[in-house]
Amino acid sequence: MTRNEIRPIVKLRSTAGTGYTYVTRKNRRNDPDRIVLRKYDPVVRRHVDFREDR
């Protein structure tokens, strides 16, 4: 297995509808479903949920 198969690069898109994204890696073995992280969105200047975008 290559490195990219185990820990692929994923985009996290803001649920506030601003279009702001973060880019991160995820471990498929620990998180087989889509990731949801609470991070800062500078467009709306507050913390919002960011969901994995495929």
Swiss-Prot record:
PANTHER family registered for this protein in UniProt: 54S RIBOSOMAL PROTEIN L39, MITOCHONDRIAL (PTHR15238), LARGE RIBOSOMAL SUBUNIT PROTEIN BL33M (PTHR15238:SF1)
Pfam families associated with the record: Ribosomal_L33
Gene3D superfamilies the UniProt entry points to: Ribosomal protein L33 (2.20.28.120)
InterPro entries, sorted: Ribosomal_bL33, Ribosomal_bL33_CS, Ribosomal_bL33_sf, Ribosomal_zn-bd
Domain of life: Bacteria
Gene: rpmG1
4Fe-4S listed as a keyword: no
Gene Ontology CC: cytosolic large ribosomal subunit
Family, similarity comment: Belongs to the bacterial ribosomal protein bL33 family.
UniProt keywords, alphabetically: Ribonucleoprotein, Ribosomal protein
A GO molecular-function descriptor: structural constituent of ribosome
Name assigned to this protein: Large ribosomal subunit protein bL33A
